[in-house]
Curated annotation (Swiss-Prot):
Gene this protein is translated from: rpmE
Gene source species: Bacillus licheniformis (strain ATCC 14580 / DSM 13 / JCM 2505 / CCUG 7422 / NBRC 12200 / NCIMB 9375 / NCTC 10341 / NRRL NRS-1264 / Gibson 46)
Function according to Swiss-Prot or TrEMBL: Binds the 23S rRNA.
Family as reported in the entry's similarity comment: Belongs to the bacterial ribosomal protein bL31 family. Type A subfamily.
Sites where the protein binds Zn(2+): 16, 18, 36, 39
Record's GO cellular component terms: ribonucleoprotein complex; ribosome
InterPro entries (alphabetical): Ribosomal_bL28/bL31-like_sf, Ribosomal_bL31, Ribosomal_bL31_A, Ribosomal_bL31_sf
SUPFAM superfamilies noted in UniProt: L28p-like
The protein's assembly and partners: Part of the 50S ribosomal subunit.
GO terms for MF: metal ion binding; rRNA binding; structural constituent of ribosome
Protein name as catalogued: Large ribosomal subunit protein bL31
BP GO terms, sorted: translation
Disulfide links within the chain: none
Keywords: Metal-binding, Ribonucleoprotein, Ribosomal protein, RNA-binding, rRNA-binding, Zinc
Amino acid sequence: MKAGIHPEFKKATVKCACGNEFETGSVKEEVRVEICSECHPFYTGRQKFASADGRVDRFNKKYGLK
């Protein structure tokens, strides 16, 4: 590897939308995320249902199909 061409790797604070914060390594000092291991349904065991329907579901609702 060439010297002097790689970005500086430092401690970074990761901030989640749920309020959870933890430290990791990154080239940025602060990283913001929408979902972390504290609020993701896979890790919490709680299922969140998305309110946004897909295009097919909207079509079926609009025209009264299944």
